[in-house]
């Protein structure tokens, strides 16, 4: 298995030299580096295909949907093939770039700001899984899952089985799930558990997010809220990273990967500590 945490520059370079470039994202924004790289690849004759979500969740004003339509129009003008998942299509939440046998998986939507975690894998099983997912068929190979429900089970297992007495988790969205259950079990068992979630998830009182967080606070979990919106976990000598939010385990295309490489786990730990330091204690009252 060959998995490493990489910067966005490596993804852009891969797109820049690739002959066959396939992309899945929830949203992309005009002018961002990855969009410009895709335009350049299509312009020079590479085969570029992109799949975006056509009806993003919690998009009451339609801004994300309009943004995706604008990106689709722009990419098509350069010769790329773009699909917008509609009401009858399986939702697109997987963030992936597949270029000539290398899969780049992001826990966010390849933002230009760099506040994301990207893993690159050349493992033939991983690459085959990502390719199948981009074709609409989810699966798992023991450490990588391309369906949300399975990805969250992988994360929950890492939380339960991680050695030591510290568990750190970040998720943009949060609710009752295998992850919340595993966190509660570890906290009640005496582990020091920290959880970081997106502040925007707590805008409305009486939500599932608030109820799930209240239960964890009662169990002794330390909770903060922030704006980094990453999705990762560190538990002892193992970690997990993905684009799957720790919410209801739906059978949708997404991704999550368990990692044991010391360098990758260290990178996840560094990302968590940076995000944690910038966050603030949760206030549910």
How should each PLM-predicted stretch be described?
Residues 1-19, 24-163, 178-182, 189-264, ...:
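HKD-type phospholipase D/PLD-like phosphodiesterase module
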Residues 169-174:
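Long, repeat-rich segments with strong aromatic
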Residues 271-285:
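Charge-patterned, long linear interaction tracts outside catalytic cores
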């Amino acid at each position: 298995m060959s998995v490493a945490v990489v910067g966005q520059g490596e993804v852009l370079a891969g797109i820049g030299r690739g002959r066959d470039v396939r992309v899945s994202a929830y949203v992309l924004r005009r002018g961002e580096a990855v969009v410009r790289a895709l335009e350049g690849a299509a312009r020079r004759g590479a085969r570029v295909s992109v799949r975006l979500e056509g009806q993003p969740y919690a998009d009451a004003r339609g801004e994300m949907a309009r943004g995706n339509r604008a990106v689709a129009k722009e990419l098509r003008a350069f010769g790329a093939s773009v699909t917008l998942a509609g009401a009858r299509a399986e939702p697109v939440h997987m963030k992936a770039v597949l270029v000539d046998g290398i899969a780049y998986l992001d826990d966010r939507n390849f933002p230009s700001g760099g506040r994301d975690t990207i893993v690159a894998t050349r493992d033939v099983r991983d690459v085959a899984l990502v390719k199948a997912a981009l074709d609409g068929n989810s699966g798992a190979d023991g450490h990588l899952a391309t369906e949300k429900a399975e990805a969250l089970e992988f994360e929950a297992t890492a939380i339960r089985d991680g050695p030591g007495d510290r568990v750190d988790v970040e998720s943009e969205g949060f609710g009752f799930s295998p992850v919340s259950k595993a966190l509660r079990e570890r906290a009640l068992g005496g582990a020091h558990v920290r959880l970081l979630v997106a502040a925007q998830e707590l805008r409305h009182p009486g939500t599932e997010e608030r109820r799930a967080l209240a239960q964890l606070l009662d169990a002794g979990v330390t909770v903060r809220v922030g704006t980094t919106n990453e999705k990762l976990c560190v538990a002892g000598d193992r970690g997990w990273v993905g684009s799957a939010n720790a919410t209801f385990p739906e059978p949708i295309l997404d991704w999550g990967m368990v990692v044991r490489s010391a360098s990758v786990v260290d990178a996840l730990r560094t990302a968590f500590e940076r995000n944690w330091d910038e966050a603030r204690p949760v206030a549910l009252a």
